[in-house]
UniProtKB/Swiss-Prot annotation:
It comes from Corynebacterium efficiens (strain DSM 44549 / YS-314 / AJ 12310 / JCM 11189 / NBRC 100395). Positively regulates the expression of the exporter LysE. The lineage of its organism: Bacteria, Bacillati, Actinomycetota, Actinomycetes, Mycobacteriales. NCBIfam families: argP (TIGR03298), PRK03635.1 (NF002964). Residues 1-57 form the HTH lysR-type domain. This is Lysine export transcriptional regulatory protein LysG. Keywords: Activator, DNA-binding, Transcription, Transcription regulation. Belongs to the LysR transcriptional regulatory family. It comes from the Bacteria. InterPro entries: ArgP, LTTR, LysR_subst-bd, Tscrpt_reg_HTH_LysR, WH-like_DNA-bd_sf, WH_DNA-bd_sf. Disulfide bonds: none annotated. GO terms for molecular function: DNA binding; DNA-binding transcription factor activity.
Amino acid sequence: MNPIHLDTLLTIIDEGSFENASLALSISPSAVSQRIKALEKSVGRVLVSRTQPAVATEAGEVLVQAARKMALLQAETREQLAERLDEIPLTVAINADSLSTWFPPVFAEVAHWGAVTLTLRVEDEAHTLSLLRRGSVLGAVTREADPVAGCEVLRLGVMRHLPVATPELRARYTVDGQPDWVRMPVLRFGPNDVLQDRDLEGRVDGAVARRRVSVVPSAEGFGEAVRLGLGWGLLPEAQAAPMLAAGDVVQLDEKVVDTPLYWQRWRLESRLLARLTDAVVDAARAGLRT
């Protein structure tokens, strides 16, 4: 397989289309198509679904994984030869709550690594592993303890979420001194919000139809929506603590949600990936429960 063709495949997946890949590679769209056709001919498989955005087929995912590993190792080799970093890309899948709470110290660490670039893909912690399997990222924060084939896994710690709402909302939706979980407005982060989707487990018997649900797809915006009374929600302990201390919100009951988090990364002999792993683990130890 031609390394140039593999790099072209990776660029298409990262950029989302053949046209965007042609701009990134400074070649014509027809040249991009010719390279992919040549690669598909060499392996005898269709590698890219021509959708918007373009996605790798099952066979293509295998080559995308290989291409991403090669790109990292090639960049590190250039570093060793030139004694400098050459815009080495580190791609990570992470959930929004982690990104807004314990993960930021990683930025401070990576900032001192020369020309290294960090690309984050935000997804629910129950779904970040799919990006790792597809080769879209080199590492992922996930709730899955079982390693993906070809990856190693490290336990990071436990993220605790608290059920909170404004005192006014709590007072307005109360039945016999308890929160009226069925009628109280609730918040969701998005369609893949596994944590919030299970918020009524242990609180209400059976399914509840037609709840009043607002969707706020931003960790910071979600917290503000809770603080300003749009609905109740499960907030990370670190995010909820200052609001509770200020009296902006109250904890609705003692039922908390503890989610173990893990770091999964490709098993590569990569100094930079090892340094990134150390930075992630250190940040998690400082910001998560054990």
